[in-house]
Curated annotation (Swiss-Prot):
Keywords: Membrane, Phosphoprotein, Transmembrane, Transmembrane helix, Vacuole. It comes from Arabidopsis thaliana (Mouse-ear cress). Disruption phenotype: Reduced efficiency of intracellular multiplication of tobamoviruses (e.g. crucifer strain TMV-Cg), characterized by a reduced amplification of TMV-related RNAs. It comes from the Eukaryota. This is Tobamovirus multiplication protein 2A. GO terms for biological process: viral replication complex formation and maintenance. Expressed in rosette leaves.
Amino acid sequence: MACRGCLECLLKLLNFLLAVAGLGMIGYGIYLFVEYKRVTDNSVTFDLTNGDQSYVSFGRPILMAVSLSSNIFDNLPKAWFIYLFIGIGVALFVISCCGCVGTCSRSVCCLSCYSLLLILLILVELGFAAFIFFDNSWRDELPSDRTGNFDTIYNFLRENWKIVRWVALGAVVFEALLFLLALMVRAANTPAEYDSDDEYLAPRQQIRQPFINRQAAPVTGVPVAPTLDQRPSRSDPWSARMREKYGLDTSEFTYNPSESHRFQQMPAQPNEEKGRCTIM
């Protein structure tokens, strides 16, 4: 019990940190969106010359413009990066809420959904990392940016690659730890099936019934002393277990000191008086 409580407290703490991270991403994404709208209203639009497309340059590197070229990203909004950033924050917050609800209510279903969402998030992150690592032309797959802001961000990540690498690895390890804790808490809250007479007698439906249902018949006449069938049944856990599992009435096979009067000893025959003649 103490170990389960410790695991639940640790899982709640880590989920709280995950929720704070998600809310932070949502708040910062909203701030970026407000800045984007403000800069868009005050931006300078270049005129089209020789069939070239127009671009908008922003003061912040993350608020970069997306060229309106004829590729698969034509249908993306200009602020797709902000929407993606907010979406990741919402996903983290929803996952953390699912984990908190499952931990507080000790719901096996919520903990299972939480574990599934975590493993999906880890797989997506690993797939994205593998795509960047193995595909050397991954930069060509991104929407083109002629403002130079993407190169600025890329150079910043490359210069601080050691820090960025450990931060990314720490995030994956953190999520893997959450996944393992969720599995442990789920296993601790799973109801056990007891099938031994020495273990806790869990309340469950009585599946096995006695082979013979004894029904007391009305008796008329002079009342007599209680017989075996009229004895009250015992209500201790072992007797209840025997009646449930085997359909046995333990009052017939066990000794109860309170009913010791049932077994009346036969009166001892009087010893023969000594001094009398005995005929052989």
